[in-house]
């Protein structure tokens, strides 16, 4: 019986060590940061048609894919509600890039407690393979960031998913 209890305690301790926690990662040289439950590795840098820097990363954990796209706008735009229109246009572009076939519609008006210039929106997507997505986009007129989580099949919305989607930090917040 003692051996069984010792083995049980060791296994429980091992499982606790395997539990994932949020860790903050630098988004390339953008000055922005994001919290992930898995290691996204080195952020890949590419350039958009207007020469804006585009940083991307994705990792998998708990049968979910966790990702981020961060665009450092070459020409900073407007802030406040007008910036939501630019963000919505970018999300529309991403729907095509990710083969999204249906969406719930943008939930606008999200703000960040410590950063008045930030505007955000959420949406729920389904792609051509039947994968379910939840996304949250942010902009401050200088950056556009899209945090996303998707699952093969049904995506269970959990506190963990929402914590991740709220885990973006603009350069100006540092």
Task: List each model region and its residues.
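Surface-exposed amphipathic alpha-helical segments
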Residues: 20, 28, 40-41, 83-102, ...
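A short acidic-to-branched-hydrophobic micro-motif
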Residues: 56-89, 145-148
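Acidic, metal/ion-handling microdomains and their immediate structural contexts
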Residues: 8, 70-72, 172-174
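Short acidic/polar N-terminal linker immediately downstream of export determinants
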Residues: 20-29, 47-49
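Solvent-exposed loop/turn segments at secondary-structure junctions
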Residues: 73-76, 130, 152-155
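Bacterial Sec-dependent N-terminal signal peptides
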Residues: 1-22
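Signature of long, low-cysteine stretches enriched in small and polar/charged residues
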Residues: 32-58, 91-139
């Amino acid at each position: 019986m003692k051996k069984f209890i010792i083995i049980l305690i060791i296994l429980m301790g091992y499982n606790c060590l395997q539990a994932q926690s949020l860790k903050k990662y630098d988004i390339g040289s953008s000055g922005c940061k994001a919290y992930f439950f898995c290691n996204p590795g080195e952020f890949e840098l590419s350039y958009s048609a207007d020469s804006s820097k585009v940083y991307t990363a994705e990792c998998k954990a708990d049968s979910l894919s966790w990702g981020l796209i961060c665009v450092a706008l070459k020409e900073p735009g407007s802030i406040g509600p007008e910036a939501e229109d630019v963000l919505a246009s970018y999300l529309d572009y991403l729907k095509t890039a990710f083969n999204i076939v249906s969406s719930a519609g943008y939930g606008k008006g999200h703000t960040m407690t410590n950063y008045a210039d930030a505007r955000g929106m959420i949406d729920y997507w389904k792609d051509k393979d039947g994968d379910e997505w939840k996304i949250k986009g942010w902009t401050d007129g200088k950056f556009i960031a899209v945090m996303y989580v998707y699952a093969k099949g049904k995506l269970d919305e959990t506190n963990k998913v929402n914590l991740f989607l709220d885990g973006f930090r603009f350069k100006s917040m540092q």
